[in-house]
Design a protein with these regions (language model features):
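Rossmann-fold NAD(P)-binding glycine/threonine-rich loop
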Residues: 96-148, 153-166
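Hydrophobic/aromatic beta-strand patches that form the interior of the parallel beta-sheet core
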Residues: 28, 70, 85, 135-137, ...
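Internal alpha-helical scaffold of NAD(P)-dependent oxidoreductase catalytic cores
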Residues: 25, 130, 151-182, 193-198
Length: 198
């Protein structure tokens, strides 16, 4: 795996793009407007500079990470990736549309992941021709500082897809926990709500 596409240059997408680039991956950061993409890359640069200032990152590492990030508004170009991570609005209709589009644009080997924290992966994957290569990949805010990632299997998600994604998580310094079946709120949110209710 060499190239990661992140769809959505908001708070979560920017964080995911940052840790992927810092982990050595080439990153395509895509959003609907160039202004949003430029703002996202600017935020990543500021975040990395803060890490340099705190001696958590060298200037050379910062420059190398930034050089790996490419911004675009072209959805078709975004399909040239080994892993696509969708981080857009938490709306099922929007996510279904994006996954259908990416399914038609990406090579057959590409894994498609959603950063959703609650929505059904099985339903998101239903209109694609690669449900075995679709999973939930729930990062936590702020992404560069939170080590946990929930990997959520849909009904047809292949074990190989999970294995490849776990390897990616490890390389970017994340601890992954696998949910073998979907449940509302996944693992973390269910645990937090249970504690709050207690």
């Amino acid at each position: 795996m060499r190239t990661i596409t992140v769809l959505g240059a908001g708070i979560m997408g920017v964080g995911i793009a940052q840790v992927a680039a810092a982990g050595g991956y080439n990153v395509i950061l895509r959003d609907l407007q160039k202004r949003l993409v430029d703002n996202g890359i600017s935020t990543i640069e500021k975040n990395l500079q803060a890490m340099v200032d705190c001696a958590q990152f060298s200037r050379e590492q910062m420059e190398e990470a930034l050089a790996r990030i490419e911004g675009t508004t072209d959805l078709e170009y975004s399909g040239q990736a080994d892993l696509v991570i969708e981080a857009v609005v938490e709306n099922m209709a929007v996510k279904k549309q994006i996954f259908t589009q990416m399914d038609s644009l990406c090579p057959p080997h590409t894994i498609l992941a959603s950063n959703t924290s609650t929505l059904s992966i099985t339903e998101i994957a239903a209109n694609t021709h690669r449900p075995d290569k679709i999973l939930g990949m729930h990062f936590f805010y702020p992404v560069p500082k939170r080590p946990l990632v929930e990997l959520v299997k849909g009904l047809e998600t292949a074990d190989e897809t999970i294995d490849i994604t776990r390897e990616f998580c490890a390389r970017i310094g994340k601890i992954s926990v696998v949910l073998n079946r979907e449940s509302p709120g996944y693992l973390y949110n269910r645990m937090v709500l249970s504690l709050i209710n207690e």
